[in-house]
């Protein structure tokens, strides 16, 4: 058993290097290349990406908040084809400090890779500042508020795409996307069409605590990296404060340009009725009110209980999440 534990610990400590030996199919022909002032090499292996597009990709990379760790990134490659048999758009190799972007024949502009590039740079960020984040019981894991048993620690010897969202490496990379990554504004006109809620930038793992309101984690990251988290990235979950036949009221952060969609499912033994209500916040209030009077709802007393959740999107960044579902007796 002691021998097994020793081998296990060695493998865990070696993980950042082991994953870097993953092979990728790279065409022999280089179509374009560019070196940034920091010394980052941008290399295209597809005719779809010329030098000008590589320079634009570099500008896209800079939209991700960064510190001196960016100078240690060696290369960003763009391949025309796919990665093995998967449909992934990117990967990061920690030994060579290289980001590889796939499907360059299909995605031909930097904005097409915005979220992917942020996520892969998030891996670079994570291994630079938190080199042991892939280990159980790390300081990051404790402050992140996720139980060790709720995460997968076997990516390097038993990787399974089904558990991608539960590997600590992927959780921290997505944390970076939401707290430091490049953002895009969305139009308020798209609220009623629901498009912004489907297209928002959100954490892949919606079963873990909301990173956008974990202020203790924010302070920890800022202290360790020296990179401040913009106040616009902080979005707290609404709290139900009042419910009656006319309105449903929540307390929220006093911020404007936050779109909310209330998902209200009314249930009894015979039927379910789903109602969606929309509101956009203003800066001068910390109360969110949904009006039930104008909705095509049968008398609430005809139902036994309701299930409610709220979809949230910051219109200035497209970042958001869905709250946990809450059951309310009627």
Predicted regions and their residues:
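N-terminal Sec-pathway targeting helices
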Residues: 1-10
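Pan-zinc metallopeptidase signature
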Residues: 6, 14-26, 31-32, 183-330
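Auxiliary, metal-adjacent structural segments of Zn-dependent hydrolase domains
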Residues: 38-95
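Surface-exposed patches in mature extracellular/periplasmic domains of secreted proteins
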Residues: 67-80, 133-138, 185-203
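Short pre-active-site segment immediately N-terminal to the catalytic Zn-binding motif
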Residues: 99-117, 164
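Substrate-binding clefts and substrate-entry loops adjacent to catalytic sites
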Residues: 101-102, 139-163
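Catalytic Zn2+-binding segment of zinc metalloproteases
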Residues: 121-139, 182-184
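An active-site-proximal "capping" alpha-helix that borders the catalytic cofactor pocket
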Residues: 168-182
